[in-house]
């Protein structure tokens, strides 16, 4: 009788089943990693937008002379607005209108410029010529509502001059 070498059909089926199960597990890990990557990418885009907006605001505020009350601005703006006077005769206000966009308005022109869509501002001023600014943006990922916020403390360079 001849000696037969090789795998039986059952051994081949078991090996194929183990291989398919391994591929399924690896694909599950891949999908989970991909979802995590996409979530983090979207989150970082939102945070980058907030920091770019904060940089625009900081550059202007640092050149300001003094903080003002929102009631001192020529037009009606929300109470949580950031209002400050510049070295010339202008007063600048940053405010959110109906949680839809962040606007910048100068008292000399009274036309609002959109700074960032979907970004809300909240500002607290201190008597020492500084303020705490918080920017917030709501965003959605796969049907889940998320909110990101950043904060920065800014000092006026020309305070008291």
List the model feature ranges, each with a label.
Residues 1-3, 147:
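N-terminal cationic leader/targeting segments used for protein routing and processing
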């Amino acid at each position: 009788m001849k000696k037969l070498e090789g795998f039986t059909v059952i051994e081949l089926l078991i090996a194929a089943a183990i291989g398919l199960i391994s591929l399924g597990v690896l694909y599950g890990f891949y999908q989970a990693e991909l979802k995590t990557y996409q979530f983090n990418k979207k989150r970082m885009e939102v945070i980058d937008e907030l920091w770019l907006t904060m940089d625009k605001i900081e550059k202007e505020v640092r050149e300001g002379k003094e903080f003002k009350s929102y009631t001192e601005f020529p037009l009606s703006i929300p109470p949580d607005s950031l209002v400050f006077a510049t070295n010339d005769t202008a007063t600048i206000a940053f405010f959110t209108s109906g949680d839809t966009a962040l606007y910048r308005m100068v008292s000399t022109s009274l036309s609002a410029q959109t700074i960032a869509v979907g970004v809300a501002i909240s500002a607290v001023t201190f008597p020492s010529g500084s303020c705490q600014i918080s920017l917030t943006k709501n965003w959605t990922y796969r049907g889940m509502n998320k909110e990101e916020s950043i904060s920065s403390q800014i000092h006026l360079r020309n305070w008291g001059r």
